[in-house]
Curated annotation (Swiss-Prot):
Lineage: Eukaryota, Metazoa, Chordata, Craniata, Vertebrata
Organism: Mus musculus (Mouse)
Annotated glycosylation sites: 191
Oligomer and partners: Homodimer; disulfide-linked.
Protein's name according to its UniProt entry: Embryonic growth/differentiation factor 1
Signal peptide extent: 1-23
Gene Ontology molecular function terms on file: cytokine activity; growth factor activity
UniProt-listed PANTHER family: EMBRYONIC GROWTH_DIFFERENTIATION FACTOR 1, TGF-BETA FAMILY
Amino acid sequence: MLPVCHRFCDHLLLLLLLPSTTLAPAPASMGPAAALLQVLGLPEAPRSVPTHRPVPPVMWRLFRRRDPQEARVGRPLRPCHVEELGVAGNIVRHIPDSGLSSRPAQPARTSGLCPEWTVVFDLSNVEPTERPTRARLELRLEAESEDTGGWELSVALWADAEHPGPELLRVPAPPGVLLRADLLGTAVAANASVPCTVRLALSLHPGATAACGRLAEASLLLVTLDPRLCPLPRLRRHTEPRVEVGPVGTCRTRRLHVSFREVGWHRWVIAPRGFLANFCQGTCALPETLRGPGGPPALNHAVLRALMHAAAPTPGAGSPCCVPERLSPISVLFFDNSDNVVLRHYEDMVVDECGCR
């Protein structure tokens, strides 16, 4: 029977699944959990238990769209691309207005207009290396009386309480309808680092008989691309993962389940609760190095090394190594330190197939 890996071994094997050039190596003093956080592109775990605000439906849809089990039914997923939004990216954040529930409406600057609001989006958790590819403002207005037919909404950059900034857009705003507007290139610059804060001034312009309304919801859907987490283009074979069978002790895929609860991350990781990382283990001696039907063909160099090792073992040369041949990605949905819902996509996290190299 194969030995059972301890918790530290689980973390170490998971780290070994990722290319060593993806991010800077962790200092030797780091523990397994801290090193894993760095590999996942997180400076630290959330310091406190989040409020567990409801996960927005759009984030669930994006997460399920990235689920490899569902993706194989249709067309293959493109690495570092958010298909549902049609943009490049590997990180999606749903950022609510940081003070909507407690911030009162401000008096209108012009007589005859409805009160105004200032919405603030905290983007301080975005890394400097990330580049925005979509910044979608989402607003919902509700009527305060039944005779409201709708309004015209003006969105401007906030300058100060006395002088509004430049107007970004002006759109019809029917009550109860979710309004969406792209702010990339206006409030959020394209191909540049994301600002720490986006502050917007909202103004309602009622019709001839319309009453004023209230701001019920305000959020920002931010998609960014972190090139450090994007692999080089390569040919992928989209086949079902399997735990290979073969003679005991030969090179094949072994099951390894990584549980976020065991690492202590279940309070802020929304989904998945864990995943099968798997790992490679076994010997690469002849004739096992020459894989049979259904397995990946060994390199000629690996076959030659196995043959030479069997005929005349050379000290220090050794036999071929059992390594991952095919890997697949996972996506993780979690709360960050600002209670934002974040979806991150990670390539090469699951070992699907092993071979001798």
